[in-house]
Amino acid sequence: MTKADIVENVYQKIGFSKKEASELVELVFDTLKTVLQDGEKVKISGFGNFVVRGKNERIGRNPQTGEQIKISARRVLTFRPSQVLKAMLNGEEYAHLKDEDDDDDYDDNE
């Protein structure tokens, strides 16, 4: 599914004009990007959590040559699906599940 597909779904299901649907989708994604760029977590109930984690500098190996190389410190985006989403994907009953803040066990400096 692409961003254009999401806009089309919003247009068809909510009845906004295509321009309004596009602006809404852009606003949502811009907000998510800004929050994540600021290092904050995004928790979407029934869907999952997006978390920016810090990765420390480390030594790795070039798989072709075996040569050791330095891998710079960086930030990575991780996604952890909610229990509800996992159950839905596996065709399991999910009405009894509650969303939990499962992201508290992330190690920010792996």
From Swiss-Prot:
GO cellular component: cytosol
PROSITE patterns linked: HISTONE_LIKE
GO molecular function: DNA binding; structural constituent of chromatin
One Pfam assignment: Bac_DNA_binding
InterPro entries in the cross-refs: Hist_DNA-bd, Histone-like_DNA-bd_CS, IHF-like_DNA-bd_dom_sf, IHF_alpha
Keywords recorded for this protein, A-Z: DNA recombination, DNA-binding, Transcription, Transcription regulation, Translation regulation
Keyword Transcription regulation: yes
Top-rank taxon, per record: Bacteria
GO BP terms, alphabetized: DNA recombination; positive regulation of metabolic process; regulation of DNA-templated transcription; regulation of translation
Reported function: This protein is one of the two subunits of integration host factor, a specific DNA-binding protein that functions in genetic recombination as well as in transcriptional and translational control.
Family: Belongs to the bacterial histone-like protein family.
NCBIfam families cross-referenced by the UniProt entry: himA (TIGR00987), PRK00285.1 (NF001401)
Subunit structure: Heterodimer of an alpha and a beta chain.
Protein name: Integration host factor subunit alpha
Organism lineage: Bacteria, Pseudomonadati, Bdellovibrionota, Bdellovibrionia, Bdellovibrionales
Name of the gene this protein is made from: ihfA
